Amino acid sequence: MAQTLYDKLWNSHVVHTEEDGTALLYIDRQLLHEVTSPQAFEGLKLAQRPVWRISANLAVSDHNVPTTDRSHGIADPVSKLQVDTLDANCDAYGITQFKMNDVRQGIVHIIGPEQGATLPGMTIVCGDSHTSTHGAFGALAHGIGTSEVEHVLATQTLLQKKSKNMLVKVEGQLPRGCTAKDIVLAIIGQIGTAGGTGYAIEFGGSTIRALTMEGRMTVCNMAIEAGARAGMVAVDDTTVEYLKGRPFVPTGAEWDQAVEYWKTFRSDEGAQFDRVVELDAAQIVPQVTWGTSPEMVTSIDGRVPDPEREKDPVKRDAMERALAYMALAPNTPIEAIKVDKIFIGSCTNARIEDIRAAAYVVKKLNRRVAPNVRLAMVVPGSGLVKAQAEREGLDKVFTEAGFEWREPGCSMCLAMNADRLEPGERCASTSNRNFEGRQGQGGRTHLVSPAMAAAAAIEGHFVDIRRLG
């Protein structure tokens, strides 16, 4: 019987299935960070349980680490306690960890693939909703809660119910100026933030196949914003080429065996999906969110929508509340929206490809950050991304134009560290969530691609980067 990619991943990891369909899944890799792991380790200690498979875990601090000078440590006592606790727990249990001043430190969903700890055919979990990122490698990856983190540490298994299968098929050539971020925002705009609820999404089609691994990770990263717990892309030569030579990847004869196995992780011809969504890549234009949910998105050449034109009273009410929070008037051209801060970073868009795309725009415009922009910051996703960008001279491109070049971490994606918006500040952000208060109490977030964020920094408002050539 023909199987989908998700079917293959699921079936190859089922240990036991109950009569109600609940399955015990074996977990190949658990990624840990400082926010959702302390209680899990405490539970192990209280029960006097060991970590079942130490080598299956990889840890890093990312949410609370400062992105400015780290020579004096972490100023905030709560953040410091969380980071110190992860350090102590990993030392106690012998878990591999990249500590704050290790060059390999970075955002957990960037360092996993970067190190080759994310591999095709794996089940991967982390106490973080954007674990779906790793599905770009033909893996089944999703976020879990703190009690589940403890369960995986203790048993290397997880109780789950199988999702339905959805295929999101994007065909055609992506227009100039459009990126993977625009693809996934367009998908969410079409199906809504509940469109993928109850499904595991496979992203396919010629447009997805043409993306780099960085681009595929961006798309899978935001599967959760489409309502799905997991997103994934079939394994191909692009996947294999990215992984070759990375630290955690098999070598020699084992590499050849692994590649042969990995390439089986694709949907079979004739495999049945419960839902299929199709997009024409040629119709995608640079996207900008205007509201307080990722589904509240439109094109750069569009206008802020008018709630009066929405017939559904529930949707109309949500639009009105979003516009009030965002301090936007209906029918305002998107290009007329001015910004106060720029954030280029996050597990969605802080890889070397993203940094290069933003730097290209800055060089092309050949001007400094606009006077009305109070802060424009670039936060690489890992120490290795930062080092690569500096070897290419990209840090100088940014700093000479008035951007701040920071240390790696989650940074302004969420108001959990020193990088945050003040009440009323408007930010062009390459992150994944634009909820009320996400980047700071009263902060207003517009989700865009790295190129769009860089252009907004220079112009002081959103602009259509397709005009840059």
Curated annotation (Swiss-Prot):
It catalyses: (2R,3S)-3-isopropylmalate = (2S)-2-isopropylmalate. Pfam families: Aconitase. It comes from the Bacteria. GO terms for molecular function: 3-isopropylmalate dehydratase activity; 4 iron, 4 sulfur cluster binding; metal ion binding. Its cofactor is [4Fe-4S] cluster. GO terms for biological process: L-leucine biosynthetic process. Binds 1 [4Fe-4S] cluster per subunit. The keyword Nuclease does not apply. Its EC number is 4.2.1.33. Keywords: 4Fe-4S, Amino-acid biosynthesis, Branched-chain amino acid biosynthesis, Iron, Iron-sulfur, Leucine biosynthesis, Lyase, Metal-binding. [4Fe-4S] cluster binds at residues 347, 410, 413. It is an enzyme of class 4 (lyase). Pathway: Amino-acid biosynthesis; L-leucine biosynthesis; L-leucine from 3-methyl-2-oxobutanoate: step 2/4. Heterodimer of LeuC and LeuD. Belongs to the aconitase/IPM isomerase family. LeuC type 1 subfamily. Catalyzes the isomerization between 2-isopropylmalate and 3-isopropylmalate, via the formation of 2-isopropylmaleate. This is 3-isopropylmalate dehydratase large subunit. It comes from Burkholderia mallei (strain ATCC 23344). The gene is leuC.
